[in-house]
């Protein structure tokens, strides 16, 4: 054995000696009843195993213990309110799926990759298998984690190919994870949960606990943008695209179109630092950091796309934005101005109606309803107008059926959805890539939570990209809409500028 290997073994043994009492006393949060429907090891279905880890105040520090493990992802409830209190960390999936155009590459650990032209949503559902019990009390016990890029919508609808596809990220990047770290900010507790679908998981359990309990490796290289970000729709080009949208509306082609501009710059270092900074200045309940072979994804989304828990479906579209003010009185006035805005309420209700129709494709008839309309939710940089639509998943339907029925989210397309997507393709110079897609998880237990991938930054191929946009309707004002897009981009651009 070489000296370096011997030293590593000694270090692992030292860490194990500190965490062995935890290993010997692991227990489920709640005991599963005798004979309950649970995953059986050996048949591909196993009762989840749960070990409580020492809780660390810094989830970023815990994530860094994953080091160079492939496909590391952090689903981050950075706002840490009572409703969104859990963080989920995963890495080293036993299988990955990456879709580019009509082809999905499926790569299982240790096997040669294969390709399929079947619908990607079907492929992910197939890998998840039959619904089984999760770990009681935890939102996620293993399953699929990753993103569906906006352009995956081309597999669902006939959209022309006009915009340039210049970011070499997959349309879909999903990992199947046998284990996960789940952090409850409210209870200040942390667990490692695993299923044993991958035979290495339980064999490597002590080493995994040791890794997650050890000091993290050194920080990666600092992130730096080398030049000022450039928009693909400058002020004049944005105005021309805005006028084209309103021409479509006057002709009756659509009611609303989400028009977006993209900012791009050369960058060096690691976008991890951009994410850490972003969650400091703009914490959001549906944030995420994805460290993928193709690039890194940084997301600070305030918007839920689809949640499914115990058959209850929820979506929370955002339409309507005002900037925050440091002056408390002015800040309250901006929030009330948004609440009272007829234009923003009209935008919002258009998307509520669209999503009610989308949910109706997979929900029990009569169960879909708008439970809340025009709530104000305030974040670090903006106030948002948010509504909530709920339903009950129909028998025989799966989380992936729901995603396919609703994708991409109506709040980032417009209405009618397909017409709006065609207009977006006509007017936006570049494809959206990860932006305006969805990031989240789909568990072996049938539950799901996903975001709308807005307030998103992608680092790929020596460059960094971010986007911002908003809904254009008949009585929109070009100056107001352009400014709204800049307000939404403010936090991302500040991070890109190193502020």
Regions found by a protein language model. Give the residues of each.
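Extended alpha-helical targeting/anchoring segments
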Residues: 15-499
């Amino acid at each position: 054995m070489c000296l370096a290997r011997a030293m590593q073994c000694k270090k692992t043994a030292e860490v194990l000696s500190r965490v062995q009492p935890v290993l010997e006393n692991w227990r489920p949060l709640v005991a599963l009843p005798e004979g309950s429907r649970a995953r059986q090891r050996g048949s591909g279905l196993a009762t989840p195993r749960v070990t409580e880890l020492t809780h660390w105040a810094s989830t970023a520090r815990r994530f860094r213990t994953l080091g160079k493990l492939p496909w590391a992802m952090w689903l981050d409830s950075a706002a840490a309110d009572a409703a969104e209190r859990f963080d989920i960390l995963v890495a080293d999936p036993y299988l990955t799926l990456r879709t580019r155009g009509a082809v999905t590459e499926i790569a299982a650990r240790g096997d040669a990759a294969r390709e399929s032209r079947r619908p990607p949503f079907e492929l992910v559902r197939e890998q998840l298998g039959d619904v089984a019990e999760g770990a009681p009390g935890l939102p996620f016990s293993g399953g699929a984690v990753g993103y569906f890029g906006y352009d995956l919508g081309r597999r669902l609808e006939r959209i022309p190919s006009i915009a340039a596809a210049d970011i070499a990220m997959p349309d879909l990047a999903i990992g199947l994870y046998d284990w996960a770290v789940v952090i409850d900010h409210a209870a200040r507790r942390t667990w490692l949960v695993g299923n044993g679908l991958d035979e290495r998981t339980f064999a490597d359990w002590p080493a995994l606990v040791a890794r997650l309990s050890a000091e993290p490796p050194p920080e990666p290289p600092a992130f730096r943008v080398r030049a000022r970000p450039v928009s693909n729709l400058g002020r004049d080009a944005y105005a021309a695209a805005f006028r084209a949208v309103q021409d479509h509306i006057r002709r009756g082609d659509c009611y609303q179109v989400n028009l977006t501009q993209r900012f791009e710059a050369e960058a060096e270092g690691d976008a991890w630092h951009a994410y850490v900074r972003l969650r400091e200045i703009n914490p959001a309940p549906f944030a995420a950091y994805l460290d993928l072979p193709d690039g890194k994804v940084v997301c600070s989304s305030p918007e839920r796309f689809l949640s499914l828990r115990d058959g209850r479906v929820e979506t929370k579209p955002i339409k309507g934005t005002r900037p925050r003010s440091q002056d408390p009185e002015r800040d309250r006035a901006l929030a009330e101005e948004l609440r009272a805005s007829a234009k923003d309420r009209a935008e919002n209700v258009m998307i509520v109606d669209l999503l009610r129709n989308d949910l109706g494709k997979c929900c029990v008839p009569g169960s879909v309803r708008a439970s809340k309309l025009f709530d104000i939710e305030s974040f670090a940089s903006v106030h948002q107008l948010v509504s909530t639509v709920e339903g009950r998943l129909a028998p025989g339907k799966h989380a992936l059926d729901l995603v396919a029925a609703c994708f991409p989210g109506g709040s980032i397309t417009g209405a009618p959805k397909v017409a709006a997507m065609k207009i977006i393709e006509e007017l936006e110079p570049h494809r959206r890539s990860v932006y305006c897609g969805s990031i989240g998880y789909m568990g072996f237990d049938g539950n799901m939570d996903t975001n709308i991938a807005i307030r998103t930054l992608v680092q790929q191929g020596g460059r960094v990209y971010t986007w911002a946009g908003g809904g254009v309707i008949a009585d929109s004002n070009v100056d107001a809409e352009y400014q709204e897009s800049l307000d939404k981009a403010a936090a991302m651009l500040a991070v890109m500028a190193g502020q």
